[in-house]
Amino acid sequence: MGILEKISEIEKEIARTQKNKATEYHLGLLKAKLAKYRAQLLEPSKSSSSKGEGFDVMKSGDARVALIGFPSVGKSTFLSLMTSTASEAASYEFTTLTCIPGVIEYKGANIQLLDLPGIIEGAAQGKGRGRQVIAVARTADVVIMMLDATKGEVQRSLLEKELESVGIRLNKHKPNIYFKPKKGGGISFNSTVTLTQCSEKLVQLILHEYKIFNAEVLFREDCSPDEFIDVIVGNRVYMPCLYVYNKIDQISMEEVDRLARKPDSVVISCGMKLNLDYLLEMLWEYLALTCIYTKKRGQRPDFTDAIILRKGASVEHVCHRIHRSLASQFKYALVWGTSTKYSPQRVGLTHTMEHEDVIQIVKK
């Protein structure tokens, strides 16, 4: 029996098993086996030597955004509107066959936008260009899931299921579980909270399925067996996702209002160029970027060339971005902006910078 058949059998078994206290260990084991087989399926096959055109895209700019969606939902049109890149757009499926990068210039930052080939159902099993598409999607900072507003719910649940099965967790945080395999001493299990979904016995069963008999496990939050399996496997990617409903000009106002109120969702129309500016604002928020401007002594700040860093970056991060040896020569910095009590304020390396702050670094 091949891996796909085994996965199918386990999925059927999970679907027909009632969820209750008596079956929780059985379900936990099935989920562990399922995660194991899916991980095997995603390992690159040794026989495939051809890399495939247009997939080894070099990361450039200050952030990377992956544009994911079914064929013909408007991804190529969106890329053409947002960037200067022309991605072939047509009203038939599979127009985009390779990964097309473009750059959005927004608030002084260069954001790389990747138009990935339309994901089809079964991409996790390597159908279409699925496996390559997913490999590129895992390197992104944010995912924009482009959906057709006329059939958005069906597309959304299918795509979420596909991405979930390849280890991409959307709008979730990493489970707060400490896990460390050891050479001996058996399994040490502790928790700092009351567990309602996992027990010590279930944790041991899951670990034994992965041939782990000696480990230290500490639950710092109430997690499900699935989340514990994610911690064991370790190759999961947790990233923010914006659900973008395109073609809202083809649905009723009531439906537009319902979709717009959903969490992490934006409604747009590429054809009529509606709400694209709001989408950019939301994208900036999800990327959590900060622009920092530099100033030389006795000169005006340079507002043409910003340093782009993650929100919460410190003066030390700014030093490393300018030059790797600058932090070791650092004496103090003068900062103008919202992060200071008064301008300019003399600060040290640990001072947290805010958006559009101006900094002047003084060396020893």
UniProtKB/Swiss-Prot annotation:
Positions that bind Mg(2+): 76, 96
Q: Where in the cell is it found?
A: Nucleus; Cytoplasm
The protein's UniProt keywords, in alphabetical order, are:
Cytoplasm, GTP-binding, Hydrolase, Hydroxylation, Magnesium, Metal-binding, Nucleotide-binding, Nucleus, Ubl conjugation
Q: Write down the SUPFAM superfamilies for this protein, in alphabetical order.
A: P-loop containing nucleoside triphosphate hydrolases, TGS-like
Which EC number applies? Answer: 3.6.5.-
Which CDD domains does the UniProt record give?
A: DRG, TGS_DRG2
Paired cysteines (S-S): none
Q: Which GO terms describe its cellular component?
A: cytoplasm; nucleus
The residues covered by the TGS domain are 288-363
Where the record annotates domain OBG-type G, the positions are: 63-288
Which reaction does this chain catalyze? GTP + H2O = GDP + phosphate + H(+)
The protein's GO terms of the molecular function aspect are: GTP binding; GTPase activity; metal ion binding
Query: Which BP terms from GO are recorded?
Result: cytoplasmic translation
Positions of modified residues ((3S)-3-hydroxylysine): 21
Q: Does the keyword Ribonucleoprotein apply?
A: no
Post-translational modification comment from the UniProt entry: Polyubiquitinated.
* Highest rank taxon of the organism: Eukaryota
Transmembrane helix as a keyword of this entry, yes or no, is no
Q: Where does GTP bind?
A: 69-76, 94-98, 115-118, 246-249, 269-271
Q: Which cofactors are required for activity?
A: Mg(2+)
EC supergroup of this enzyme? hydrolase
Q: Tell me the Gene3D superfamilies matching this sequence.
A: 3.10.20.30, 6.10.140.1070
Annotated NCBIfam families = small_GTP
What does this chain do? Catalyzes the conversion of GTP to GDP through hydrolysis of the gamma-phosphate bond in GTP.
Similarity field: Belongs to the TRAFAC class OBG-HflX-like GTPase superfamily. OBG GTPase family.
Supply the name of the protein. Developmentally-regulated GTP-binding protein 2
Q: Which organism is it from?
A: Bos taurus (Bovine)
The primary gene name is DRG2
